[in-house]
Design a protein with these regions (language model features):
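Catalytic active-site module of serine/aspartate enzymes centered on a nucleophile-bearing elbow/loop
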Residues: 201-230
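Hydrophobic, aromatic-rich cap/lid helix
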Residues: 138-166
């Protein structure tokens, strides 16, 4: 698919921010000739804010849409709802299919929200840093502080947000390019495989968490490599 001149709108994951999702996708998309937009998350209205950003951008023409984790969920749902406005979907680290229930990403978001409410930002951040790789600790320390004090609400809303199920993904008109880590316990590669198996035109490329930690652009690179197969 030729992306030259296309506009790509990329949505951040829960607790993450527009800075990270931009770095994850901008380099590969710019190399392909696309314009990249990464709207800042609005933690008090995370899902609604993302959908409004997509609707606003689509007024100028069809979009490449995508994101990471809950950003991928919102993007693929928007593409299902607006089949005439979505050129392609770039889904990084999809978190679940259908209802979140006990999906690891949903459980992690609920747990973190509870810690933040109980212990406050400083203590919860210190606990996160103690149990995270350095690269992730740096990213989340910044993005959590930016979204405080509304971060717990955003996490809880995301953890309860339903993704399209397999039957709904079967109706996706746009090509779906999925990128996932083979060793991510929070975003299992099995979810990515479910999305790819369900959508009519879909492909998956993978990487490791070590590769992601070294360069977030592996997400965008993997998505564009998957898209090139379609």
């Amino acid at each position: 698919m030729n992306l030259r001149g296309a506009t790509a709108v990329l949505l951040a994951g829960t607790g993450s921010d527009d800075d990270y999702v931009y770095r994850a996708f901008a380099g590969p998309l710019h190399d392909a000739g696309a314009r990249v937009v990464a709207p800042a998350p609005q933690p008090r209205r995370l899902i609604e804010g993302y959908r409004e950003a997509l609707d606003e951008a689509a007024r100028s023409g069809p979009l490449v849409v995508g994101g990471i984790s809950i950003g991928a969920v919102v993007s693929v749902q928007w593409a299902l709802d607006r089949p005439d406005r979505a050129v392609a979907v770039l889904a990084g680290l999809p978190p679940w299919t259908g209802t979140p229930d006990d999906a690891p990403a949903a459980l992690a978001a609920r747990h973190t929200a509870a810690l933040l409410r109980r212990d406050g930002l400083a203590a919860a951040t210190a606990q996160m840093r103690a149990g995270s790789p350095e690269w992730l600790a740096v990213e989340l320390t910044r993005s959590w502080a930016e979204q405080w004090p509304d971060l717990p609400e955003a996490m809880e809303r995301a953890a309860g947000h339903r993704a399209p199920d397999a039957a709904e993904l079967a109706g996706l008109a746009a090509p779906l390019a999925v990128a996932a880590a083979t060793d991510d316990p929070v975003h299992p590669v099995e979810v990515a495989l479910e999305w790819v198996a369900a959508a009519p035109r879909a492909a998956l490329r993978t990487f490791t968490l070590a590769e992601l930690g070294a360069d977030p652009a592996v997400i965008g690179q993997a998505c564009l490599a998957a898209l090139a197969e379609l």
